Amino acid sequence: MPRYELALILKAMQRPETAATLKRTIEALMDRGAIVRDLENLGERALPYRISAHSQQHNRGGYFLVDFYAPTAAVESMVEHLSRDIDVIRGNIVKHPLTQELKECEGIVPVPLAEKLYSTKKRKK
């Protein structure tokens, strides 16, 4: 199963309501076969701009990151679930940055002088 990261912005709510929303979201992930690794609270802060979601205007929101493994088929249904949840302002699922393929730098590859001089410019006769 690939590793994903869920970035959530929740409505500004009291602590019990926020906990209930997070619990509901995590349970929805696990119902779809996900294995949750970590939940990180990034705090409540002002949104960068006013966001309309579910017929409401939001100026503040709680930011959360959820790190999880899930089957690829579960991601699409989870995005749909998040879009219907009235307490979620924004939800975005991306592949975890640490699992993306990284290529090692091969260093500087020397180019032969003749190829460098004659490959791009042909001399006039």
Swiss-Prot record:
<comment type="similarity">
    <text>Belongs to the bacterial ribosomal protein bS6 family.</text>
</comment>
<dbReference type="Pfam" id="PF01250">
    <property type="entry name" value="Ribosomal_S6"/>
</dbReference>
<dbReference type="InterPro" id="IPR014717">
    <property type="entry name" value="Transl_elong_EF1B/ribsomal_bS6"/>
</dbReference>
<dbReference type="InterPro" id="IPR035980">
    <property type="entry name" value="Ribosomal_bS6_sf"/>
</dbReference>
<dbReference type="GO" id="GO:0005763">
    <property type="term" value="C:mitochondrial small ribosomal subunit"/>
</dbReference>
<dbReference type="GO" id="GO:0006412">
    <property type="term" value="P:translation"/>
</dbReference>
<dbReference type="GO" id="GO:0003735">
    <property type="term" value="F:structural constituent of ribosome"/>
</dbReference>
<dbReference type="GO" id="GO:0032543">
    <property type="term" value="P:mitochondrial translation"/>
</dbReference>
<dbReference type="GO" id="GO:0015935">
    <property type="term" value="C:small ribosomal subunit"/>
</dbReference>
<keyword id="KW-0687">Ribonucleoprotein</keyword>
<keyword id="KW-0689">Ribosomal protein</keyword>
<dbReference type="InterPro" id="IPR000529">
    <property type="entry name" value="Ribosomal_bS6"/>
</dbReference>
<dbReference type="GO" id="GO:0070181">
    <property type="term" value="F:small ribosomal subunit rRNA binding"/>
</dbReference>
<dbReference type="GO" id="GO:0005743">
    <property type="term" value="C:mitochondrial inner membrane"/>
</dbReference>
<dbReference type="GO" id="GO:0005739">
    <property type="term" value="C:mitochondrion"/>
</dbReference>
<comment type="subunit">
    <text>Component of the mitochondrial small ribosomal subunit (mt-SSU). Mature mammalian 55S mitochondrial ribosomes consist of a small (28S) and a large (39S) subunit. The 28S small subunit contains a 12S ribosomal RNA (12S mt-rRNA) and 30 different proteins. The 39S large subunit contains a 16S rRNA (16S mt-rRNA), a copy of mitochondrial valine transfer RNA (mt-tRNA(Val)), which plays an integral structural role, and 52 different proteins.</text>
</comment>
<keyword id="KW-0496">Mitochondrion</keyword>
<protein>
    <recommendedName>
        <fullName>Small ribosomal subunit protein bS6m</fullName>
    </recommendedName>
</protein>
